[in-house]
C-alpha cells in the first residue's frame, strides 16, 4: 500500500506497480480478513499503549512479527508459505524482520489510526496491481483497486500464484506485462 500512498501524494509519479500489495493499516487495525471488531481494536490500543509506558520505563523495547520457527503443525497455509520463503535460503536475510524477530511491537500502533490508502481514489497516473489468485492477501489488492478511478488502472490476478510466489518465482512473475506497462 505504500506505493499507492506515494502515488496519491506525489503527482510527479508517472506510473505505479504493486505486487502482492498489503494494506498495512487495514491488517493492523482490522486483523487478517477483517476479523477484529471495534472492541478488539480498543483492547489492542489499551494493550499497546500500556506496553509503550512499560517499555519507556524499562528502556527495553520488544519485537514481534517475525515468521514463527519452528512452524507449528496447525499453522495456516499462508504462514507455511511465509516460512518456506523467509526461513529458508530462498528468502532468508539476517536483517529481514520477517526472517528474524520482527519489528518493534509498537510499530503496529501507528497504522491502527492512520489509514495509508485514504486518497488512492485521487491517483491520476497509471496503476498496475498484481496479485496471486491463491494469495491470502488478494483481497487487499481487489478492494484497493475498486477505489481507483480512471481507465489507466489495471488489476492483474495471476492464476495459481500465492503471495510469496510473486516475490521470486520467475515462472509466474509477469515481467513482460510489467515492462509493457511502464513503456506505455
Task: Give the location of each predicted region.
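Catalytic active-site module of serine/aspartate enzymes centered on a nucleophile-bearing elbow/loop
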Residues: 159-184
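The feature captures the conserved acid-bearing segment of alpha/beta-hydrolase catalytic domains
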Residues: 15, 110-124
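Acidic beta-to-alpha connecting loop that harbors the catalytic carboxylate
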Residues: 132-135, 160-162
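Conserved loop-alpha-helix segment in the C-terminal half of the alpha/beta-hydrolase fold
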Residues: 133-154
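Hydrophobic, aromatic-rich cap/lid helix
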Residues: 90-112
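Short beta-strand/loop motif that positions the catalytic acidic residue
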Residues: 123, 129-131
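Alpha/beta-hydrolase-fold enzymes
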Residues: 2-87
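Conserved beta-strand scaffold positions in the cores of enzyme catalytic domains, especially
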Residues: 16, 155-157
Amino acid at each position: 500500500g505504500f506505493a499507492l500512498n506515494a502515488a496519491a501524494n506525489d503527482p510527479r509519479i508517472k506510473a505505479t506497480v504493486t505486487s502482492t500489495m498489503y494494506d498495512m493499516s487495514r491488517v493492523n487495525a482490522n486483523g487478517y480478513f477483517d476479523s477484529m471488531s471495534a472492541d478488539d481494536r480498543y483492547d489492542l490500543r489499551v494493550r499497546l499503549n500500556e506496553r509503550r509506558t512499560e517499555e519507556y520505563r524499562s528502556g527495553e523495547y520488544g519485537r514481534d512479527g517475525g515468521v514463527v520457527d519452528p512452524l507449528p503443525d496447525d499453522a495456516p497455509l499462508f504462514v507455511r508459505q511465509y516460512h518456506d520463503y523467509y526461513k529458508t535460503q530462498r528468502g532468508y536475510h539476517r536483517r529481514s524482520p520477517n526472517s528474524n524477530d520482527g519489528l518493534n511491537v509498537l510499530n503496529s500502533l501507528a497504522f491502527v489510526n492512520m489509514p495509508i490508502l485514504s486518497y488512492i481514489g485521487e491517483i491520476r497516473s497509471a496503476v498496475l496491481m498484481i496479485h496471486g489468485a491463491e494469495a491470502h492477501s488478494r483481497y487487499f489488492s481487489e478492494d484497493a483497486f475498486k477505489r481507483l478511478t480512471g481507465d489507466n488502472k489495471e488489476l492483474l490476478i495471476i492464476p495459481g500464484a500465492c503471495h510469496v510466489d510473486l516475490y521470486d518465482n520467475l515462472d509466474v512473475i509477469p515481467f513482460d506485462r510489467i515492462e509493457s506497462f511502464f513503456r506505455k
